[in-house]
């Protein structure tokens, strides 16, 4: 058995390669997808990414981003990932626990990891020193338990941290494919409802 870990950014994981993310989730392929979400194309000169908040400066939105931003975890859940979690570089111990739990899950494990980009997002949006960028992330996050207790109005602009979705019943793609292969070899009738 191989344990595949794919690391992407918010740009390549949700825009340029977003189709791969969506169909990996849909099929529930047994891999671990760590999306490093710093809210901007940080390594390619600061373009707007799918998670860039409204109003933020980028080189492709020099008067402020007008695009609505994605919630990567909602996308992964809706697309069919069987394990979805969000963590932050501010809480490395909790992030490690999420990785341990997700890596042992049999199916598509998606991790949205909020990370700072103090130069291309922070400085260029006048957030101040690097620590201010971390404080900005901290101010936009809370535990899932606390998030669930907030009113709809209080939830606006806040992201829950922790395991957000887990489906232990959904069959992993290669196991479903193997069942079809075995049934075809023995001329058995395939019950496709069991493979969902």
Predicted regions and their residues:
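Thiamine diphosphate
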Residues: 1-42, 97
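Structural motif
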Residues: 3-5, 30-34, 74, 82-85, ...
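Short acidic, glycine/serine/threonine-rich loops at helix termini
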Residues: 16-20, 26, 43-48, 121-126, ...
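Short, hinge-like loop/turn segments at secondary-structure boundaries
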Residues: 24, 49-53, 102, 127-130
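Glycine-rich anion/phosphate-binding loop at the beta-strand->alpha-helix junction
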Residues: 36-54
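Short acidic/glycine-rich loop or secondary-structure boundary segments that cap or lie
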Residues: 42-44, 93-95, 111, 118-122, ...
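Conserved thiamine diphosphate
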Residues: 49-101
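Flexible, low-complexity linker and terminal segments
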Residues: 116-196
């Amino acid at each position: 058995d191989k344990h595949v870990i794919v690391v992407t950014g918010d740009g390549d994981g949700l825009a340029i390669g977003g189709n791969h993310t969506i169909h990996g989730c849909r099929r529930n392929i047994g891999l671990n997808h760590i999306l490093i979400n710093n809210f901007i194309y940080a390594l390619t000169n600061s373009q707007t990414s799918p998670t860039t908040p409204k109003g933020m400066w980028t080189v492709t939105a020099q008067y402020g981003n007008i695009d609505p931003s994605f919630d990567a975890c909602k996308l992964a859940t809706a697309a069919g990932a069987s394990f979805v979690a969000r963590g932050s570089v501010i809480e490395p111990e909790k992030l490690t626990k999420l990785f341990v739990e997700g890596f042992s899950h049999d199916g598509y494990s998606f991790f949205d990891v909020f990370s700072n980009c103090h130069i291309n997002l922070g400085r260029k949006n006048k957030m101040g020193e690097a620590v201010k960028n971390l404080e900005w992330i901290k101010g936009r996050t809370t535990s899932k338990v606390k998030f669930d207790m907030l009113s709809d109005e209080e939830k606006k602009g806040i992201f829950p941290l922790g395991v957000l979705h887990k489906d232990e019943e959904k069959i992993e793609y290669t196991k479903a494919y193997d069942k079809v292969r075995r049934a075809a070899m023995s001329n058995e009738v395939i019950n496709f409802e069991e493979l969902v």
